[in-house]
Amino acid sequence: MKVTEVKVFPVNEDRLKAYVSITLDNCFVVRDLKVIQGTSGLFVAMPSKKRKDGQFRDIAHPLNQETRAMIEDLIFEAYEKELKSMGETLVSLKRQKAPGSDYGNDDY
């Protein structure tokens, strides 16, 4: 699987820094990934839906660490490029692990 396109849509909110869409193999789009400012750095949140019990569950997510790292690296690279094109820069792209990023746990 190859990520063939990353589109970053910056937003000006407190913790939410950008929405992101990725295209896989030029034939499948995943929308509503988010770049979020956490307590110890930025992280990528997968698309999610709020359940009846108030918890959020990923709609789509990588099944292993290698795929997650590859997607996150491409998103952070595109995010930093987008900021530079807007005249902004990150002093340091401090990253943290996404909360609840347990691979393969699809219990509903």
UniProtKB/Swiss-Prot annotation:
Pfam families: SpoVG. Keywords: Cell cycle, Cell division, Septation. One of its GO terms (biological process) is division septum assembly. The keyword Cell cycle applies. It comes from the Bacteria. Belongs to the SpoVG family. PANTHER family: SEPTATION PROTEIN SPOVG-RELATED (PTHR38429:SF1). HAMAP family: SpoVG. Could be involved in septation. This is Putative septation protein SpoVG. The lineage of its organism: Bacteria, Pseudomonadati, Bdellovibrionota, Bdellovibrionia, Bdellovibrionales.
